[in-house]
Structure formats: structure tokens, C-alpha cells
Regions:
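NTP/phosphate- and nucleic-acid-binding module
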Residues: 1-473
Length: 473
């Protein structure tokens, strides 16, 4: 049954998204435009994401640090491409208390300048390398158009910054982190992704190249979900980050950075959500099971407590809804919040030592013996995780197209948008021409080679790259 507080996806996808954010108590608007309040349900998802990703990073040898939120203007401006790329989005502090500052301070839009300046002071010889650091923090970028989780003026993220003795090692790190993100999205968020290299126009300001993770939402709109950048020696030369190598000579370091944000929560909503609300993959759900006593009797509560204890002992996150609301309200609340499995404990079923299990993704119900709840819940959680991924993969496959001409691209984007595979000559003019079709942009280059017969989708000249194109959030 459709949740009356939520606009249907078919009616208005954008309104549906906003309704789910509110109905599931993920976030609220603040009194400053573009800034949101993370409510407990939303922040709990971010905490779960943090926990899993942090463990993955540490397995690879990364350590967490924290650098200041303020960046002196002169420091930010040292790398010209970086400041040029972020200048329109930087928020500045010009006074402290009642005193004007001698130099403006930028709220960090990203921290390459701070990390480079830090590495300049702590890296002396090749023995100090590599440094593999990550920080969890907030960032401020003065976006023109904002939407909760997808584009906010303040967002939470992790940004990894590493420094190496060789280009080979730094490039290996860039690729390693891209693959780490891909694994996280597919294994934990149950979101299939496409990975590749950004074009020169779309790469991170100051990077030699950018690798990207791209996901497709239910409505065929693309979401850049994580990026990994190789800087070469650009930042090292700008910030004088040098080390004494094994030949006892000074050499500039090689750097990378990589990041992902609370935008992932938006991806979860738009990839898995339905007209009832949020649908969370079990591996990332803060609460995997909701236990609902149909009546608040001692007998039913005793069974609920026993089930809750058994699930907890087996590392399944569950809770009992003991609120004074009706059972129907509790069911609907668990649904809108995306709890993967619901256990309904009622007096009639209990007479036969049975309870009802309900899976969130399909609403299918099954009656099981009370002594078989654990095994069945474990089975359901695994199956839901796999089913959500496969459903999202099916949507991605059904919305992935091949295009040979601009007319093909226009027809796709105007009817049923998605990922469009099309060859490209590499010229900026052709990339800009694609943008005239409903804002279509290159998502990533997935192949570069000496093509014999393939031609550019725009100009018809010999192609250099195979590119995935799409309309983005």
C-alpha cells in the first residue's frame, strides 16, 4: 500500500525524493539555505557508512587525521587550477569577533592545500614515505542549487590524501582506492556502478587525471558517487613538498586524493526506495530488524525480548517497538524507515509457537516457528541484500544504451534517459555540443584505443575514446 505522505515516483520523482527524506526522518531544512539538519535516522546511516569504510581504509594501511577547517587565502591560491576551479564556491571569513582579519580565511571546500602544506613540514626523506592519511570532516561549498544529501552547501565526507616517492606507487594508490569505492558500493550499498576516467573538462581541478564511480538512479539520472585523483607532482611543486631520495637528491613527491560524501545517502534513497519510503540494504542498515508486538502483553513482550536477545548475540541489529502506537502504525513506520525485516509477534500465531516475518523489499510474509527465527532472519537478510543489488543492476542494464548519432542521444535523453555508450573524438567542442541535449555530460571514459571504424557521435571524425554519457544530479 502506498504511503499517503509520499508522492509516487511515477507522478513526480523529485517530490518523491523530498517526501522520503522527510517521512523517514533523514533530514530537515535549516534556517540557512542549503544547509540541512541530519536527523537521527539519517546520521545513523552515515555512521554505518563511516564504520564500514573506515575499516576498509585501515585494512589498506590508512590512518585518520584531522586538519583545520580554515585555509589562509594565500595558501589556497598557491595551486592555480585548484583555486580557479573552486573560486565560485568558496565561503570566506573576513572578521574574527569585531576585528577585521588581515587575510581572508576560506572554509575548506577541499583540503589539498592544507595537506600539501602539512606534508611539506613532515616529509624529509624517502624513509618518511608513503604517508597514507584520511580525514572525516565537513566541507562548505556555496552551491547555487541545493537538494538534501545530493547538493548541500555543507556536507560530510571523507577525503584521503596520500604522498609517495614514485609516480608508479601514487598511480597504484589512485586505482586501488577507485576499486575500494567500487567494492563498497556494490557489496554494501547494493548499488552497481560504472568506473572510468573523467575527461579533461570534467576532471578535478589541479589533477593530472580523475577516476570516478558513477551510479544510475531509478529515473535514469546519473550520480557521481566517489572520485580518486592522481596529482603527479603538481601540488608538490606548488607547495614545495620535497624529499631526499635514495640517491641523496631532492625530489618532488607524488600525491593523490580521493573522496566520498553523504551524497551516498541520496543514492541509497534513489536506487532502492519505493512509494512506501526508504529501502535499506541489510549490510548498511543501522537497524536490520524491527520486532513488533501486536499487543503489549507480558507474554508477547517476553517472546519479543527473547528474540531480540538471540538476534543481538548473532550480530544482527534489532529493536522492539514498544511505543503506544497501533500495530498498523508501527508496521508503516518500519516500512518508511526502510528496516529490512519486520517480525510480527501476535497472540494467535504464538499459540502455535509461530511469528510472522515480513521483508521490506517485496512485502512478502512468511510464518515461522519461534525456534527458527534466527536462521530465517539470516537467510532473509542475505537474500534481500542480493535481491536489491540484482534489481538495481537490472534497472542499470535496462537503461544503458548504445548511440551512434546525436539524434540517437537526443531520442534517448528525451524519452527514457540513462547511461549512453557513445564514441568521442576527444575534442572539447563535441563534448560541449553533447551538453546542449538536456545537459548531457561525459560521465567517464571507459575505453581509449586506436579505433578502425568507430567515429565520434557528434562530428563523425575518427573516435579516440568510448565514453559513458548521461544527465547528472
Amino acid at each position: 500500500m502506498k504511503n499517503e505522505k509520499i508522492t509516487s515516483r511515477s507522478e513526480d520523482f523529485a517530490s518523491w525524493y523530498t517526501d522520503v527524506v522527510k517521512a523517514a526522518h533523514l533530514a530537515e531544512y535549516s534556517n540557512v539555505k542549503g544547509f540541512i539538519i541530519f536527523e537521527p535516522n539519517g546520521y545513523a546511516i552515515w555512521e554505518k557508512i563511516q564504520s564500514v569504510m573506515d575499516g576498509m581504509f585501515k585494512e589498506l594501511g590508512h590512518q585518520n587525521v584531522y586538519l583545520p577547517v580554515m585555509i589562509p587565502e594565500n595558501l589556497l591560491k598557491k595551486e592555480g587550477e585548484l583555486v580557479e576551479g573552486f573560486a565560485p564556491e568558496v565561503a570566506w571569513v573576513t572578521s574574527g569577533g569585531s576585528n577585521s582579519l588581515e587575510e581572508r580565511l576560506a572554509f575548506r571546500p577541499t583540503s589539498e592545500s592544507l595537506f600539501s602544506d602539512y606534508y611539506k613540514n613532515v616529509v624529509k626523506t624517502y624513509r618518511d614515505l608513503p604517508k597514507l592519511y584520511n580525514q572525516w570532516c565537513n566541507v562548505i561549498r556555496w552551491e547555487k542549487e541545493t537538494r538534501p544529501f545530493l547538493r548541500s552547501r555543507e556536507f560530510l565526507w571523507q577525503e584521503g590524501h596520500t604522498v609517495h616517492a614514485t609516480s608508479e606507487e601514487a598511480e597504484e594508490e589512485t586505482l586501488r582506492m577507485l576499486n575500494t569505492y567500487k567494492r563498497f558500493f556494490e557489496e554494501y550499498l547494493a548499488i552497481p556502478v560504472v568506473v572510468g576516467k573523467k575527461t579533461e573538462k570534467e576532471k578535478f581541478a589541479g589533477a593530472e587525471y580523475t577516476l570516478t564511480v558513477e551510479a544510475l538512479m531509478q529515473n535514469g539520472i546519473c550520480l557521481q558517487s566517489a572520485t580518486s585523483h592522481y596529482f603527479g607532482q603538481k601540488f608538490a611543486k606548488a607547495y614545495d613538498v620535497k624529499f631526499v631520495n635514495k640517491d641523496n637528491k631532492f625530489e618532488y613527491c607524488y600525491q593523490t586524493s580521493w573522496g566520498s560524501t553523504t551524497r551516498m545517502i541520496g543514492a541509497l534513497i534513489m536506487v532502492h526506495g519505493d512509494d512506501k519510503g526508504l529501502v535499506l540494504p541489510p549490510k548498511i542498515a543501522p537497524k536490520q530488524v524491527c520486532i513488533v508486538p501486536i499487543k503489549m502483553t507480558d507474554e508477547l513482550l517476553n517472546v519479543c525480548n527473547n528474540l531480540n536477545d538471540e538476534l543481538h548475540k548473532n550480530n544482527i541489529t534489532s529493536y522492539i517497538d514498544t511505543s503506544d502506537k497501533s500495530a498498523g502504525f508501527k508496521f508503516a513506520e518500519a516500512e518508511v524507515n526502510g528496516i529490512p525485516v519486520r517480525i510480527e509477534v501476535g497472540p494467535r500465531d504464538l499459540e502455535n509457537n509461530k511469528v510472522t516475518l515480513v521483508r521490506r523489499d517485496t512485502s512478502e510474509k512468511e510464518l515461522v516457528n519461534t525456534n527458527e527465527v534466527l536462521n530465517n532472519v539470516q537467510r532473509l537478510l542475505t537474500d534481500i541484500q542480493d535481491s536489491l543489488y540484482n534489481k538495481a543492476l537490472e534497472n542499470t542494464k535496462n537503461r544503458t544504451y548504445d548511440a551512434k548519432t546525436l539524434k540517437d542521444v537526443e531520442e534517448i535523453m528525451n524519452t527514457r534517459p540513462g547511461f549512453v555508450n557513445a564514441h568521442w573524438c576527444g575534442d572539447l567542442d563535441c563534448e560541449l555540443k553533447m551538453k546542449e541535449i538536456k545537459g548531457t555530460k561525459s560521465r567517464c571514459i571507459v575505453e581509449t584505443k586506436d579505433y578502425k571504424d568507430e567515429v565520434c557521435v557528434v562530428c563523425g571524425k575518427k573516435a579516440k575514446h568510448k565514453v559513458v554519457w548521461g544527465i547528472q544530479y
